[in-house]
Amino acid sequence: MKKQNPKKVLQKVLIMMLSALAISCQDTSLDETETNSVAKEQQNLTKKSSLSATSDLARRWAPIHYKDVDATGTYAEGGKSDYLTAINYDNDWNGENNWNNLPAFANSLAAHCYYSIVESKTHWYITYAFFSPRDWTDNPLLYSLDQHENDLEGVLMIIEKDGSNYGSLKGAVTVSHSDFFSYVPTGSSFVNGLESIDGTLQMRDYNGELHPVTAQDSKGHSLKAWPQHDIDGDGIIYYPSATGTAQIPSDNYDNYVEYKLVDIFESGGLWDQRFNTELFSSPAGGFKGNDFKTGGANAPWAWNDGNDAIVQTGEFATDPAKLADNYFDGVGNLSRTYINNKYNNGAGGIVTLYQNCNYTGYAIALPVGNYTLAQLKSYGIANDDLSSVRLESGYKITMYQNDNFGGESVTITGNNGCLGSFNDKASSVKISAL
């Protein structure tokens, strides 16, 4: 047997050791890459959207919109009173001349839709609002009762973040005068909550993407999911423009008119105009108007359903996660913590308290703090009426049997779908970081 050179043996051993080390490092690097990839994906779900991404998101879920038109009646202006247009269609932000300026601008009613996006850790909430200069009737007996200057109705699209660029549409709530109507697309996990679902949100292909379909009736312009309203005879079908084009209908039967999406928060836009005393009666969002009735229309931050109790005036736009969490059950791990809310950066909370087990019943979000029974009641929480809790990571809630933090207590550090022996026992709570 040939005797091996000790130096060559040592070299071979060193080469083998270095090769093994390189493979080990490579495996570790791959593990770290996979871990970082997962972490980045989770961060992307909670990362604040850029301005360009926001406008793309608004375009992605903007509705195909049916607008019924009535050309008859003293105040119809040949159907133009039902056209969509800009609030400042007459080149000013004066709310008290929109009714009377309509005849002079009747052939230049370029289609606009106002939108705003409020973003939470888990969802985007997109409000779309459609304006007409007149809310009118053809019944002379109702001229002074029903008609008013300016009309703005809209819809809220609830988009769940799922790691994709535009998320997944889960539900919608529309504004029909002083009532809200809720809808879900086929396949949504959303089910009846405090409010019953009013129908299916139809989807239709447009430029290779499915868009929701909404509709308004003529005269009063109530907005619902199509076909609960539909075109009856003459009417216009509006589509969201991908290029910022605001088209003018060719006639009352035009079935393809592009509307321009306008950010409510743009500089000098509708939100900035809330202090304009020629447009609004106050920053709270009630439009001025002096034809037939004083006012009558509202901006999104003043929209209200007259009988839904838990959701307060304006929260449709300013605290949409609250609306979604209360109107629907089956919402999954819906966060009530906002990362972009220009309407109200103090809205939402760290902890959401639910009336019933399995995150059902009314849902009230609270920020960090200590809450006596009186304070809980001010948020709409009744005594001895809580049964499940959602918590943002890194926080805890201590629930007390008695008011002023007395009696038996329980501390919760994560989501709890049913409080068991502490169901319907809380009279005060403390919320803090871990």
Regions found by a protein language model. Give the residues of each.
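Bacterial N-terminal signal peptides that target proteins for export
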Residues: K2-L14
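Bacterial N-terminal signal peptides
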Residues: V13-A22
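Bacterial Sec-dependent N-terminal signal peptides
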Residues: A22-K48
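Solvent-exposed N-terminal domain segments of exported/luminal and surface proteins
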Residues: V38-V118
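Short N-terminal edge-element motif at the start of the domain
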Residues: A86-L169
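Domain-length functional cores that host ligand/cofactor binding and catalytic or interaction surfaces
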Residues: S120-T122, S144-G154, D162-A347
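Solvent-exposed loop/turn segments at secondary-structure junctions
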Residues: S132-D135, D179-F180, N358-Y359, N404-F405
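Compact beta-sheet-dominated domain cores in extracellular/mature segments
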Residues: A347-L434
